[in-house]
């Protein structure tokens, strides 16, 4: 079914965007002056 394919692709796209946002927030916070968590 085409709807199922669309949903799967949409979920993949959302996951990709979420991961990108997550990485950006991590990279953005790592540049600010504060001690590393590790």
UniProtKB/Swiss-Prot annotation:
GO terms for biological process: regulation of blood pressure. GO terms for cellular component: extracellular region. It holds the Pfam family Hormone_2. GO terms for molecular function: hormone activity; toxin activity. SMART domains: GLUCA. Expressed by the venom gland. Glycans are attached at residue 32. It is found in: Secreted. PROSITE patterns: GLUCAGON (PS00260). The keyword Glycoprotein applies. O-linked and free exendin-1 and exendin-1b have vasoactive intestinal peptide(VIP)/secretin-like biological activities. They interact with rat and human VIP receptors 1 (VIPR1) and 2 (VIPR2), with the highest affinity for the human VIPR2. They induce hypotension that is mediated by relaxation of cardiac smooth muscle. Belongs to the glucagon family. This is Exendin-1. It comes from Heloderma horridum horridum.
């Amino acid at each position: 079914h085409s709807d199922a394919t669309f949903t799967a692709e949409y979920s993949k796209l959302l996951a990709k965007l979420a991961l990108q946002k997550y990485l950006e927030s991590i990279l953005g916070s790592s540049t600010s002056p504060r001690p590393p968590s590790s």
